[in-house]
């Protein structure tokens, strides 16, 4: 049975692939964007991420709300993931599911250590790590149906299915990247299969 999905951040590297992979599976996809056109054949709603009233009205009637927003300027400390995530977590109803794309720093390296706390983490990603952590620590305690998707460095590339996923932990792999298409593939499959709730999933190319 197909799901009704709305994607925030649909014009970005991952957002486009999330839309693409969900369309492949026959889900009904809408996007909330600033632009007035979109390359895929989807319903689109034009609006700003700061417009709480419009977003509250827009997400009504969807089964799944996906946030793939992010700050594309790594040097800019302005948080994007956290404020949008916190807003959506406040607005969704009890029968809706919220899927948020964060980063692999939210996953565990071992029983005691988060990946974000390991030595040698890239300095240029410190703002992103802070943004993701702010989102996770505010949303994880809530009594809502959420799921954090935690990929390592996302690069251009369509889905090939050759990736690893693990709940709570970062999967062991020699790879240091993941194709945006594989992130989209996992999210689309999870929307159909509905295996995980109130948790986080690490992703990396195999």
Positions of PLM-derived features:
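Core catalytic loop region at the nicotinamide-binding pocket of NAD(P)H-dependent oxidoreductases
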Residues: 146, 193-206
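Conserved catalytic-site region of short-chain dehydrogenase/reductase
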Residues: 74, 105-110, 154-158
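Conserved beta-loop-beta element that borders a ligand/cofactor-binding pocket
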Residues: 136-158
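Glycine/proline-rich active-site loop of Rossmann-fold NAD(P)-dependent oxidoreductases
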Residues: 158-164, 190-199
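NAD(P)H-binding glycine-rich loop region in Rossmannoid oxidoreductase-like domains
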Residues: 37-94
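N-terminal Rossmann NAD(P)H-binding glycine-rich loop of SDR-like oxidoreductase domains
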Residues: 5-25
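Substrate-positioning beta->alpha
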Residues: 82, 131, 175-188, 199
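Conserved Rossmann-fold NAD(P)-dependent oxidoreductase catalytic core, especially the SDR/UDP-sugar
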Residues: 30, 86-127, 141, 147
């Amino acid at each position: 049975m197909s799901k009704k999905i709305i994607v925030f951040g649909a014009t970005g590297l991952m957002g486009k692939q999330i839309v693409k992979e969900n369309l492949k599976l026959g889900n009904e996809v809408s996007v909330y964007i600033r632009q007035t056109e979109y390359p895929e054949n989807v319903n689109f709603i034009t609006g700003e991420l700061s417009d709480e009233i419009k977003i509250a009205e827009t997400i009504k009637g969807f089964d799944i709300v996906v946030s793939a927003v992010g700050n594309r300027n790594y040097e800019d400390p302005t948080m994007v993931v956290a404020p949008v995530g916190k807003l959506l977590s406040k607005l969704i109803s009890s029968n809706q599911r919220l899927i948020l794309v964060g980063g692999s720093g939210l996953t565990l390296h071992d029983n005691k250590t988060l990946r974000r706390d390991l030595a040698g983490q890239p300095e240029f990603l410190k703002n992103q790590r802070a943004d993701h952590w702010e989102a996770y620590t505010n949303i994880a305690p809530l009594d809502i149906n959420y799921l954090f998707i935690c990929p390592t460095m996302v690069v251009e590339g369509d889905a090939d299915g050759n990736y690893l996923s693990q709940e709570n932990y970062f999967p062991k792999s020699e790879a240091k990247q993941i194709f945006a298409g594989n992130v989209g593939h996992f999210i689309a499959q999870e929307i159909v299969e509905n295996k995980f709730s109130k948790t986080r999933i690490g992703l990396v190319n195999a």
